[in-house]
């Protein structure tokens, strides 16, 4: 699991409460790094790896490598693989924020062109109902409205920085694009409000992905079942509390989500680690009150009970009941909601 994190960039103007998270490939190596020889290598590779539809693939690890002519030729050939372009795992918006910083140090017009194409790619992922899918694909769970790993939230956060006329992005956006981004942002917030799950007449939180037609919680991979997410909902609530002059609908959504978080703390169990008989580090779910309260990443839609599942998709209530690989290779519990409570108290005071 990738927790919701805020990557703070030196000298970067932040929204109140929210910053734009970047994947490691585009993070500055040190202060005053933009414009350095290494950053120029990264910039060339970012331009080289932009797909023909304007997006970037995820999990690329070699942005800092100086490519040989043969390697550059091979990478150019994959530009046509547009189905790999995504907003998952911080892809595309990381590259765009990097280019914006790099432009300040080295105003190359190619960065402007690439940035605009990247924004258009993001806009192309949005449905009329305001939700964003994570890939430009037409089949499988990739078509769902995706809150998983904060994909949609991170795009909206970037858009919000742009709409606030953050100086970092001013060279890239004209009035026509501002209007597109404003319309997209407004639809995105509306979609968030419409997808908040209502349980027995009471609003709760969100699933990691929602059906693009019905807006109902949806399944992704076999072990990612329709549920209420104690993880992905954190980024959504954080974003909503970052908006100035929140409407009555936004206020209601935040209050309801925070009530759900407060009511569904896990106070009596914790994750611990053992060394098993084969000498491998293994997770266990044990009775304990030490450390932070936890929340389930997946909670049943009707009971709020946390659960887990293996690749067979069968619901279990203890990670010891699923295989080693999924037990240790996925984040089933999180303490991320803890960060919301002090922010929520300040937010409530500001409403008065």
Predicted regions and their residues:
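Positively charged n-region of N-terminal signal peptides that target proteins for export
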Residues: 1-4
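Eukaryote-skewed repeat-based solenoidal scaffolds used as protein-protein interaction platforms
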Residues: 112, 116-119, 123, 139-196, ...
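Solvent-exposed loop and edge beta-strand segments that line ligand/cofactor-binding
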Residues: 26-35, 77-91, 140-152, 219-232
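Terminal, non-catalytic domain-edge segments
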Residues: 20-42, 161-187, 213-220, 224, ...
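Long, well-ordered core segments of solenoidal/helical folds
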Residues: 42-54, 114-131, 181-201, 253-270
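Intrinsic, low-complexity N-terminal interaction/targeting segments
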Residues: 56, 61-63, 69-79, 128-139, ...
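N-terminal carbohydrate-binding/catalytic regions of secreted carbohydrate-active enzymes
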Residues: 36, 40-93, 98
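Bacterial N-terminal signal peptides
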Residues: 7-16
């Amino acid at each position: 699991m990738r927790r919701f994190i805020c990557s703070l960039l030196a000298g970067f103007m932040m929204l109140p409460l929210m910053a734009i998270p970047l994947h490691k490939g585009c993070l500055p190596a040190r202060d005053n790094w933009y414009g350095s020889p290494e950053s120029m290598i990264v910039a060339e590779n970012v331009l080289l790896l932009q797909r023909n539809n304007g997006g970037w693939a995820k999990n690329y690890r070699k942005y800092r490598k100086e490519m040989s002519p043969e390697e550059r030729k091979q990478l150019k050939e994959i530009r046509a693989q547009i189905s790999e372009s995504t907003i998952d795992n911080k892809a595309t918006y990381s590259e765009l924020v990097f280019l914006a910083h790099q432009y300040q140090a080295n105003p190359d017009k190619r960065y402007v062109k690439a940035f605009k194409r990247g924004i258009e790619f993001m806009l192309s992922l949005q449905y009329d109902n305001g939700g964003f899918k994570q890939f430009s694909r037409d089949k499988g769970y990739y078509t769902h409205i995706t809150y998983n790993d904060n994909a949609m939230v991170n795009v909206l956060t970037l858009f919000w920085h742009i709409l606030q006329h953050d100086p970092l992005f001013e060279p890239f956006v004209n009035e026509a694009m501002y209007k597109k981004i404003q319309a997209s942002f407004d639809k995105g917030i509306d979609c968030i409000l419409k997808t908040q799950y209502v349980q027995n007449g009471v609003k709760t939180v969100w699933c990691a992905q929602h059906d693009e037609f019905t807006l109902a919680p949806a399944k992704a991979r076999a072990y990612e079942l329709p549920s209420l997410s104690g993880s992905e909902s954190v980024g959504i609530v954080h974003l909503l509390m970052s908006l100035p002059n929140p409407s009555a609908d936004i206020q209601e959504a935040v209050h309801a989500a925070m009530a759900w978080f407060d009511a569904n703390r896990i106070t009596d169990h914790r994750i611990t680690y053992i060394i098993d008989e084969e000498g491998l580090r293994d997770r266990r779910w044990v009775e304990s009150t030490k450390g932070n309260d936890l929340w389930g990443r997946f909670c049943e839609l009707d009971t709020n009970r946390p659960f887990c599942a293996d690749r067979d998709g069968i619901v279990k209530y203890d990670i010891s009941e699923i295989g080693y690989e999924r037990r240790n290779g996925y984040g089933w519990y999180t303490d991320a909601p803890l960060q919301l409570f002090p922010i929520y108290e300040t937010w409530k005071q500001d409403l008065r």
